[in-house]
């Protein structure tokens, strides 16, 4: 049974892998046997922490930089990475941003950047990498969704809209590609101890309210995403399509 979870010989492209959830996923995939292509807006091209940790596991790592809010930069990255890696087996759409402002003050610049990074770039990357997977009749695409795929959030209208759309995109792509050998799914993190939640964790009242709703009684951490990512990237999930896997300590069950 364990061989179904092996990613030996696979190549995984992980966006937003410099730190946090993306780094945790990249390391989990490497631990399962995959070589890693990492890309983030500010990832060091050589010598990054994630590269060093992947290589310490005996796996290969190639780093790229890309500003996912810049359409031209995105297409240039796609052209480069496809030339360097003709066969990408696993795509993890994890790169994202969150910009906070009350809806009445949420300017076009904030809205556009969040939608470009969290939705538009992820569709384009999935389309361009996914078409190669469809041609081979084999591939795995994993999106990072959110609790706000299901809930509205507070003072993050662009983020909530983008993550709600990701839930629909996962199902839309799955409807087209599940019968063509490509599994498209998502992981929805709960409240995780990362840079994105620093303001919440430092707000003692808000942090206490959040912890009070999580049945497991703790914030999540990047290591909590290794197992779910390996599962969705592996043959063990060959009949899983269009799913959004909650990794939230039980939050959505309350």
Swiss-Prot record:
<protein>
    <recommendedName>
        <fullName>2-dehydro-3-deoxy-D-gluconate 5-dehydrogenase</fullName>
        <ecNumber>1.1.1.127</ecNumber>
    </recommendedName>
</protein>
<dbReference type="InterPro" id="IPR020904">
    <property type="entry name" value="Sc_DH/Rdtase_CS"/>
</dbReference>
<dbReference type="InterPro" id="IPR002347">
    <property type="entry name" value="SDR_fam"/>
</dbReference>
<dbReference type="GO" id="GO:0047001">
    <property type="term" value="F:2-dehydro-3-deoxy-D-gluconate 5-dehydrogenase activity"/>
</dbReference>
<feature type="active site" description="Proton acceptor">
    <location>
        <position position="159"/>
    </location>
</feature>
<comment type="similarity">
    <text>Belongs to the short-chain dehydrogenases/reductases (SDR) family.</text>
</comment>
<dbReference type="InterPro" id="IPR036291">
    <property type="entry name" value="NAD(P)-bd_dom_sf"/>
</dbReference>
<keyword id="KW-0560">Oxidoreductase</keyword>
<comment type="function">
    <text>Involved in the degradation of 3,6-anhydro-L-galactose, which is the major monomeric sugar of red macroalgae. Catalyzes the fourth step of the pathway, the reduction of 3-deoxy-D-glycero-2,5-hexodiulosonate (L-DDGal) to 2-dehydro-3-deoxy-D-gluconate (KDG).</text>
</comment>
<keyword id="KW-0119">Carbohydrate metabolism</keyword>
<dbReference type="Pfam" id="PF13561">
    <property type="entry name" value="adh_short_C2"/>
</dbReference>
<keyword id="KW-0520">NAD</keyword>
């Amino acid at each position: 049974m364990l061989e179904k979870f092996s990613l030996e010989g696979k190549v995984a492209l992980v966006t937003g892998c410099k730190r946090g959830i993306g780094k945790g996923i990249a390391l989990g995939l490497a631990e399962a046997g995959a070589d890693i292509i990492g890309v983030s807006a500010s990832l060091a091209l050589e010598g990054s922490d994630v590269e060093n940790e992947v290589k310490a596991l005996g796996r290969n790592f190639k780093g790229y930089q890309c500003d996912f809010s810049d359409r031209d930069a995105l297409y240039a990255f796609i052209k480069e990475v496809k030339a360097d890696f003709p066969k990408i087996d696993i795509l993890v759409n994890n790169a994202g941003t969150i910009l906070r402002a009350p809806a009445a003050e949420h300017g076009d610049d904030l809205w556009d950047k969040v939608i470009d990074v969290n939705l538009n770039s992820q569709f384009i990357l999935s389309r361009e990498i996914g078409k190669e997977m469809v041609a081979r009749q084999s591939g795995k695409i994993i999106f990072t969704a959110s609790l706000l795929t299901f809930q509205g959030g507070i003072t993050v209208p662009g983020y909530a809209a983008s993550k709600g759309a990701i839930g629909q995109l996962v199902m839309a792509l799955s409807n087209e590609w599940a019968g063509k050998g490509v599994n498209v799914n998502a992981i929805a993190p709960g409240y995780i101890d990362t840079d994105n939640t620093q303001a919440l964790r430092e707000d003692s009242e808000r942090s206490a309210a959040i912890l009070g709703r999580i049945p497991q009684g703790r914030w999540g951490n990047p290591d909590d995403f290794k197992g779910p990512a390996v599962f969705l990237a592996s043959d063990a999930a060959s009949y899983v399509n269009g799913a959004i896997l909650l990794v939230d300590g039980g939050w959505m069950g309350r």
